[in-house]
Amino acid sequence: FCDLLLVEADGSRRRPLKVPAVHEPVIPSFADMVVGVIGFDCIGKRICDTAHRPDDVAGFLGKRTDEPVTWMDVWKIIRSEDGLQKGVDGRRFLAYLNKADTLEDPCVAEKLMAQGQESGIMMICGSLQRSVNS
C-alpha cells in the first residue's frame, strides 16, 4: 500500500495542450483527486503546432487550427467539464499550469490564477523541469 499513487489517465504525446476524446480520461474509481495539466508553452502558438489532436482542440475552442492559443482559450479548457475537468465527478480537482518558466508575460499566469480563484478552482503554476525563481 502507499499514501499517494499517481496515475496518468490521459496522455497527450508530449504536447502541452489537449482536450479529452470521447473515451478519455480513464480515471480509476479509487481516485479521490484529479490533477489536470496544461503547459504554458502553448500560449501564443498555433493550435496545429502545440495541441494533441489539433482538430479536436480547435473545434472545442471554436477556432481554426492555424490560430494561436490565448490565455482565455486555456481558461476555457480548464473550467470546462468537457475539457480538463472531464470525468472529475465530484473528486477534488487541481489544475497544474506547467512550464511557467517559458512565459514571456507573467501577467498571463496572474490572469489565469485570478480566474481560478474567482471560480473556486484550485490552480498551481510552476515548472516540473526548472526552478521558476532562478
Ranges and model annotations:
Residues 17-18, 105-107:
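A short acidic (Asp/Glu
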Residues 1-86:
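Phosphate/Mg2+-binding loops and adjacent switch elements
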Residues 3, 32, 91-92, 121:
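Short coil/turn segments at beta-strand junctions that form active-site/ligand-binding loops
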Residues 39-40, 60-65, 80, 92-105, ...:
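G-domain G4 guanine-recognition motif of GTPases
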Residues 80-93, 119:
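A structural motif corresponding to the C-terminal end of an alpha-helix
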